[in-house]
Amino acid sequence: MTQNHPLKWFSVVVVIVWCVLFLRAENTEKSIVRALFLEQTDTGWSAGLFYQFPEASADASETDAQIRFALASGQTPQAALTQTEEKLPRKASYRLCDYLVLGQESDFDTLQTCESLFLEHPYGRLASRVFCADFSGTALETQNEEDEYLPESLLDLLKSDKTAPHLYENRNGVLLPVLELNDGELSDREERLLLTETGQVTLTADQTEAALFLSGAKHTCQFQSETNPVELTSLAQSVELEGEDFHLVLTCRVPPDGRRPTDEEIARWETLCTETVRLCWENGSDLLRLSSVQALRDGTNTLTTKNACPEVRASVKMLDL
């Protein structure tokens, strides 16, 4: 028993040393991919990787290493990614790849291609937040040659948007933030791009606010008025079925430092909500899940966006808290 005691301690030390060496190799000997850029081109696909090396930690969401960018092309997304990985200083690790940026010619098929790619290969996660760019990978690569901190600015922009949809949410269409690159400066538009199985449409800034508000992506919205912007916070939202029509009820309040909207402004907001619901429906997105509301009442789901948009009216109830 006494003779085995030193051997046990030696075994424990060996295991600890092995774990330390393994974790060090896992953390510092890989190129940590933070975001993925994919676009379809005339000749195939382009894939860009925003990565960090070698100080990045595979177990932390915040890292200190400078973000770098590598771009390559291929006949398929996988081939393009393989070519891009060959440009990295070490083997790519996608454990912290939380963002997917689609190129300017992307459509709903591109989304589904990415979903299938992530399911079959470890290039990203279905929980990745999705964005759309109005620039090409080549334009980004060219600008990066002039500004080495551009990839870092882009990652900061991606991280700051908590309303971008996850890739797995694409079944009902997705409302994508649109990134711009003008004179070397990155920004995101107030207008968003709605991608659905049947097409795509760009929503205005107010329609975007309404869509994010109604979908639950934002609990506070701001829309323009003739004087100052009006800000509302959602307390509750319900959809009631009245015959074949729907009644959307929004219970809201004004933030402590905000002003109460006038009756005319509330009426405009109600109209904006119904117009946004109809616009999304006509482009293949059931923003309020009206089909589910009908199915709960009737027991069958016969209402789809292939049908004409049902009549929807909105009512806003203001509470003073």
Predicted regions and their residues:
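Membrane-proximal alpha-helical signals and transmembrane carboxylates
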Residues: 2-321
